[in-house]
Amino acid sequence: MAITNGNVGSGQTVDVLTVPAGKTYAITSVLITNTGSEDPTGGQDSRFYLYAVTGSYTANNSMIVNNAVLPGAETFTLDTEKLVLAENDKLKVSVSGTNSASVVVSYLEV
């Protein structure tokens, strides 16, 4: 099992994982954490999108999570099913709002 991680700033869309040529990966989990502090008023909330992209990037055709609210200091976990990506496929994360997000992806080569 391997992991990759990165930081996605507010207003950015980042490729958090790109499958190399000749490889296939099974994504076992994706963790997205709001780097802001806990704030019951919602002042540290951010929103995020998660995409699995093949070929050209088309948001409406590749969206896994759509504009989800991620409160300050909270973590979203996607781990109920494996997501299989072939060579050149990508996982992208887009963040908007007050804070950046830390993203960790766990995967297996298959």
Sequence positions of predicted segments:
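C-terminal interaction-tip segments
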Residues: 1-29, 34-35, 54, 87-88, ...
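Intrinsically disordered, low-complexity Pro/Gly/Ser/Thr-rich segments with frequent PxxP/GP/PP motifs
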Residues: 56-88
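Short, surface-exposed beta-strand/strand-loop-strand elements in extracellular ectodomains
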Residues: 37-66
